[in-house]
C-alpha cells in the first residue's frame, strides 16, 4: 500500500537538492545516505528526484556528481544543475527553480542523513494543512568536534532564542512553494553576513511558518578543522531583519512541562498508509474548529524536544542501529558513534544577549539617523567633544529628532543633564559586561546593523572600535563611520596606546570614512603612523563655549599687579587626577615655587577617573601646600575663574584640550606643557606660555614669574588668546565641518 494517494503518485512528489562545490570525495557518503533515504520513500510509493547543484564545483566534485547519473544508482531520476554564483543562497534558490516536486528537501554536500529522515518528513508534510518546515530531530556533529544538538519546534521557543542562536540546521524539507515564496537572501561571502540559513529561519519564523523536527531522525554534520561553512561563518553576522516582526511571531511565553516526541512505529506507518485517505480528512475535521494557533499549541505540547538524556553508556538499540548504518556509509563517524552516550549536548541557553539586544534597539529606534557613541558623558575634554557633535547633529534639519547618544560604559560616570536638548540618550545596561568579549563585540555590531544609522561618530568609544575589528566590513557597508583620536595614552615607560592602534591588523580602517581629531599635530602623527591619506584624517577644531561671552576685563587676571603672601598669585589646575595629566608635576612645581619664596597658591579641581592611587596622591598634594577643591561639573564655566590669575596644564599627552580654549575665552591666561595639539592654540608668548614638557619644572616656574611680573604682557596675552579662540573655535565653522560628515 502506498504512502500517497494514487492520483498524485504519477508525478514527482519530492525533490532532494544536494548543494556542492569543493567536497570532492566527501560528496560520496552524502549521496549514499540520500540514496538510502530515497529508497525508503520508494518502498512507500513516493516518487522522487535528486538534484545535485554544482556551484563553482571543483573537477573532483563534478566528477563524483556525474557518477550518480548512471542508471540504477538511485531509485529516482537524477539531474545535475551547474552554477557559478559562489553563494549557498543562490545554489538553493537555483534548486528551487529547477525542482519539479511538490515538496523539496535540502542537504549540503558533505553532511549525511538517516534513511528515515525524508520518510518522516513526508509523513508530517502530507498531513499539514498549511506551510510547514521540517528538520531532523537531532544533529550529530563529527570530525573536528563531536556533539549532539536536539532540534526544537518553533512553538517551544521565543524570539530571544532565535536572535541568540541559529536553532535549526540548514537541512530542511517543506512544500516547494515555501522556498518559492521565501527564497534565501543572497549574502555574498565577501560581505561578511550570514549564515544565510539563519536569516532564512528568522524570515520564515516571522512569516508564521512552523519549524518542527521529524521524530527519530538524525542528521550528521561534518565539522572541519579548516575551511567549510562552520569556519567561514565564525565572524559572520546577521544583516538587517525585522526584529519587531520576530518578537510578534515568537513572543515570550512560559513553557509547559516538556514532553518527548513519540516515534512513529513501523506498524503505525503501515496503518497510516492504509488509511491515508480516511485519516487525513478526519484529522483535519477534528482540529479545524480549534484554529491554527490552538493546533500549534497542541503540537508544541506533543513535540517538545527537551528529552531526557541517556544515562552514560546506555544507547537504545534503535539509536545504535541508526548510528551503525551511518558509520557504514561514513567510517569517520565511528568514533563519534562509539562515544554517543557521553557526547556533549548543545542546548540553546539564555545568557542575556537577546534581552540586551532587544532593549537597546527599542530604546534607540526612531532616533538613530545619526548616532554619537561614547563610553560616558562627563566633564572631560572628550566629553565636551561628544556633546558638540550631538548638538551639531540634532540642530541639522536632516537629523532633527533622530539623533541619539549611546553610552556603553560605566553609567555612574555619566552626567545626564549635559546631554544636549533634543538628543535621545541611551545607556547600555551594566549586564552587557557580563557577556564574553566575543559576544559584546557581536551584540554591539548587531544593534548597529539592525538600526543602520546614516552617520556614526564614535568619540573614544572603545566598544565600537572592538566591534569594528571583527565586523568592520559589515558595519561600514551600513553606515558612514567616523572615529576620533585626539592623543595617545601612555603605559609603562611611555608606550603609546589607543583602541584604534591597539589592533595589530587595523583592517577596519579601510571601512570607516575618516578619523577625526581636533589638532594638526595629532593629525600629522596619525597619518604618518597609520599610512592614511589626507581624506582619511580630518581636523575639527571644537567649540568650547556656546554662547561665547564677551571678553571680561574685570577679572583678577586682567587687573592685579602686585602679589604678596597675603595676596598671592592664584593658579587653577582643573583636570583629571590621572597619570597622563601629571599631577606629580604639579607637586614638583609647588615645591619649587615654595623653595624660591614666590607668593603663589595652586588650587586643584577634579577627580580621579582611571587611576587608583587616590589616597597617597591626595596626601602628597596636601603636603606640597596645594589646595584641593574637589570635583566639579559643567566645565570651566562652573568654576570661579575670575578669581584666578592663570591656568596650568601639566599633561604628558593631549589632543587639543578644550579647557585651554575655554580658559582663553574666559580671559584666563594659559601656561601649558608643549604636548600634542596644545601648540595648535597656545603660541608661546602670544596666546599663552609654553614649557618644553611636563618635566620642565624650571620652564613652568619661569612662565609663572613672567605673568606675575608683567601685567602688560598678561593683558596682551589675554586679548590675543581671546581673539584667536573665537576665530578658530567658533560654532558656525564647526557646524559646517559636521555637515560634511553626511
Each language-model region and where it sits:
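Non-catalytic membrane-proximal stalk/linker segments that position and tether the catalytic domains
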Residues: 1-10, 240-244, 251-369
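Glycosyltransferase donor-sugar binding loop
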Residues: 53-55, 405-412, 601-615, 628-630
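Nucleotide-activated donor-binding/catalytic signature segment of Leloir-type glycosyltransferases, i.e.
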Residues: 69-79, 423-429, 614-632
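Glycine-rich, basic loop-to-helix element that forms the pyrophosphate-binding segment
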Residues: 83-99
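Acidic donor-binding loop at a coil-to-helix junction in glycosyltransferase catalytic cores
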Residues: 191-200
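Aromatic "clamp/platform" in nucleotide-sugar-dependent glycosyltransferases that forms part
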Residues: 652
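Short hydrophobic beta-strand element within catalytic cores of glycosyltransferases
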Residues: 669-672, 682
